[in-house]
Every structure is written in C-alpha cells, then in structure tokens.
Amino acid sequence: MKTLFFATTNENKINEVKNILDIPNLNLIVPQNFNIKETGKTFKENSLLKAKALFEILNNNQNVFGEDSGLCIEALNLEPGIYSKRYDTYKLCKKLSTNEKNQLILDLMKNEKNRKAYFICNISYISKNGQILNFEGIIKGKIALSLNDKKNYGFGYDSIFLTKNNKKLSDLTLEEKNKISHRGIAFLKFKKFLLKSLFNS
C-alpha cells in the first residue's frame, strides 16, 4: 500500500480527484484543518505553496501534492484567474453564494461579444525524497449567456462554462466531466506518473 497526501480541504475537489486517481493499493489521505493562504501570483505558485506547506507538516518524508485551479476569461483580462475561489471578496469585498458569484461573472460579461474562456488546473507533487514535479491541464470553452436553471452536477463556475460541444460542465456527470475537464486532464497525467514511479507499472 502506497500513501499519498492531498493538500486540500475542498470536498468537491476531493471527490473529483478520488474518481480519477482510482489506483488499487493507493491510500489517498486528506489532512484535517489544512488552511494555507494562497499568496502566489500564478496557479503553479499556489499549488506548490500548498504542497510545500503540507510536506513540512509531515516532517518532509511523505509523498504529497497540492492543486490550484481556476477560470480565466479573455474579456476580463483573464480574471477571475487565481482569485476564482474568492472572486467575490476580491471584486466586491463581500462573500457571495456560488450562484451569486456566477451571476457576478454574467453581469460583468453582459455586453461582451468575446466570451472565450478556459479552466486551468495545476498540480505540484513533492516526493518523499524532495523531488518536485508539475502537471497541468486546460479545457477551452466560452462563458454561457445564462445560469443553469435546472438541477445539475458540478460546482463553482461549472454552470456558466460551455464546452466546445456547447454543453455546460454542470450538465455532465462526474465521470463525463473528468474525461474532458482541466482537472481530469492534469490528474490523468499525474496518474500515469504515479503508476510508473510508485507502482512500476
């Protein structure tokens, strides 16, 4: 049994990652009360920040990884970007619900013809011997004109992001989403690496 620590407390991310990293004899552990300020200026810096913090907490001798991801919109100068999770407080200095955050984006995009956007996911892995590796995934699409008004899957900005097939990410099941999403792409690369490095397969 191999052990791998994930530097997050985001339940939605945990569920997606567990679905992708479905490797026999891999024990994926998520720390409790893990809270690190994301002070990096890029997704890569933030994912490494989380991984390094957890690596130190675990006395520098466990395999760990951190992940940072977000939505980048061309017409908004690639915002919300690294502020995706906290775009409400960054933009309005107050907390909003997920639907309200999505509506904020739609309001900002109201008169924009260019609706191109992409989701990006960056993974930073630190092996127990201190080796650092990085994995990245991107899905390109566009911002929808309205919110989903039906019961849907997904979380965050999934309900306003249209894929190239003109489907919202929130219309896809977890399995369908993981086949094409930024997180799915990045973690599939990571999974291949883990199978080779930890399990020699």
Swiss-Prot record:
Pyrophosphatase that catalyzes the hydrolysis of nucleoside triphosphates to their monophosphate derivatives, with a high preference for the non-canonical purine nucleotides XTP (xanthosine triphosphate), dITP (deoxyinosine triphosphate) and ITP. Seems to function as a house-cleaning enzyme that removes non-canonical purine nucleotides from the nucleotide pool, thus preventing their incorporation into DNA/RNA and avoiding chromosomal lesions. Homodimer. This is dITP/XTP pyrophosphatase. Substrate binds at T8, T9, N10, E11, N12, K13, S69, F155, G156, Y157, D158, K177, H182, R183. Binds 1 Mg(2+) ion per subunit. GO terms for molecular function: dITP diphosphatase activity; ITP diphosphatase activity; metal ion binding; nucleotide binding; ribonucleoside triphosphate phosphatase activity; XTP diphosphatase activity. Keywords: Hydrolase, Magnesium, Metal-binding, Nucleotide metabolism, Nucleotide-binding. Signal peptide: none annotated.
